[in-house]
UniProtKB/Swiss-Prot annotation:
One of its GO terms (cellular component) is cytosolic small ribosomal subunit. Signal peptide: none annotated. It holds the Pfam family Ribosomal_S17. This is Small ribosomal subunit protein uS17. Belongs to the universal ribosomal protein uS17 family. CDD domains: Ribosomal_uS17 (cd00364). SUPFAM superfamilies: Nucleic acid-binding proteins. It comes from the Bacteria. InterPro entries: NA-bd_OB-fold, Ribosomal_uS17, Ribosomal_uS17_bact/chlr, Ribosomal_uS17_CS. GO terms for biological process: translation. The keyword Hydrolase does not apply. The keyword Transcription regulation does not apply. Part of the 30S ribosomal subunit.
């Protein structure tokens, strides 16, 4: 028998951190554009995800990539995989 290597393709999304008030958790706002079926206009749809941040390193305004994982709590099934762009401090 052949030993097959199991490769799992986990979903990844890119979004903006809108809250880091929870311990080891950030709220990430993910926006995507969808074409309206009747009018043809592109509409921005958004959804918020709770993502695991083990070291509490990400701040509000950071652009991060999140990756799907096993359920970590009732509302948290994503982890922050990397920082895409840090927030500008004015």
């Amino acid at each position: 028998m052949n030993d097959s290597v199991k490769t799992s393709l986990k979903r990844t999304l890119v979004g903006k951190v809108v809250s880091n008030k929870m311990d080891k958790t950030v709220t990430v706002l993910v926006e995507h554009r969808v074409k309206h079926p009747i009018y043809g206009k592109y509409v921005v749809r958004s959804k918020k995800y709770h993502a695991h941040d083990e070291a509490n390193t990400y701040n509000e305004g950071d652009l991060v990539e999140i990756q799907e994982t096993r359920p970590l709590s009732k509302t948290k099934a994503w982890t922050v995989s990397r920082l895409v762009e840090a927030a500008r401090i004015i």
